[in-house]
Amino acid sequence: MKNRALFLDRDGVINRDDGYVFEIEKFVFLDGIFELAGAAKALGYLSIVVTNQAGIGRGYYSEDDFFRLSDWMKGVFATEGAPIDGVYFCPTHPEHGIGRYKVESRFRKPNPGMILAAQHDFDLDLGASLLVGDKESDIQAGSTAGVGTTLLICDRDASRVATAASAVVRNPRDVIPFLTGPGPDAGSF
C-alpha cells in the first residue's frame, strides 16, 4: 500500500514569513503547526516539506545556512513528537538567481518537481495526500502533481480569495479536519 503525505510549504505555513528567513533566532513557528504534524503522524501521513528557497539563489544566504536551519527545525518537530520525514527545496530563481542559480527548474514551484521527487522517494499516493501552502504557486504545484487536497493558508475572508485550492484555512490547526475528509464547510470561515 502506498503512503500518504502531508506536504507543507515552509515560510508562511511552518513559520512566520518574514522574508528570506535563514537564522534560527529569527525562525518563529506558526501556532498549530505541531498539532497538525502530530495529527498527521497519528493518522499515518508522512510530513514532507517542499519549499522554494530563492534566497540562496539571490545570494542572501548559503545552502549550508539552509541545511543548518532545516536540521534544527527537524529536531524541534521530532522533540514535539511530530517528525518531518523529508525536506525538498529549490534554491534557484530564473530571473534573480546569481550564477548557477539563475536557471529555470522543474523543482521550483509552481512546477511539481519537488512533489514528484518525494512521490518517487517515499512511494506516495498523491491522490490521497494533502498540500498546505500560503501562495497560489504552492497550490498550482500540488494540483499539477495530482495531490488530492490542496489548502491555502490565508488570514483573509475565504470568500474574497481567488484560489484554485480545495479550501482556504486561517492557520495550520484548521487543516487537521481535512486529514480525515473534506473538512468542515470547506472554503469558509
UniProtKB/Swiss-Prot annotation:
PANTHER family: D-GLYCERO-BETA-D-MANNO-HEPTOSE-1,7-BISPHOSPHATE 7-PHOSPHATASE. Monomer. It catalyses: D-glycero-alpha-D-manno-heptose 1,7-bisphosphate + H2O = D-glycero-alpha-D-manno-heptose 1-phosphate + phosphate. One of its GO terms (biological process) is capsule polysaccharide biosynthetic process. Its EC number is 3.1.3.83. The keyword Metal-binding applies. InterPro entries: HAD-like_sf, HAD-SF_hydro_IIIA, HAD_sf, Heptose_bisP_phosphatase, Histidinol-phos. Mg(2+) binds at D9, D11, D134, K135. Pfam families: Hydrolase_like. SUPFAM superfamilies: HAD-like. The keyword Cytoplasm applies. It comes from Burkholderia mallei (strain ATCC 23344). The active site is at D9, D11. Substrate binds at D9, R10, D11, D17, D18, G19, Y20, T51, N52, Q53, A54, R108, K109, K135. GO terms for molecular function: D-glycero-beta-D-manno-heptose 1,7-bisphosphate 7-phosphatase activity; magnesium ion binding; zinc ion binding. It comes from the Bacteria. It is found in: Cytoplasm. Its main location: cytoplasm. This is D-glycero-alpha-D-manno-heptose-1,7-bisphosphate 7-phosphatase. NCBIfam families: GmhB_yaeD, HAD-SF-IIIA, Histidinol-ppas. The lineage of its organism: Bacteria, Pseudomonadati, Pseudomonadota, Betaproteobacteria, Burkholderiales. Pathway: Nucleotide-sugar biosynthesis; GDP-D-glycero-alpha-D-manno-heptose biosynthesis; GDP-D-glycero-alpha-D-manno-heptose from D-glycero-alpha-D-manno-heptose 7-phosphate: step 2/3; Capsule biogenesis; capsule polysaccharide biosynthesis. Belongs to the GmhB family. GO terms for cellular component: cytoplasm. The record marks T51, K109 as: Stabilizes the phosphoryl group. The record marks R108 as: Contributes to substrate recognition.
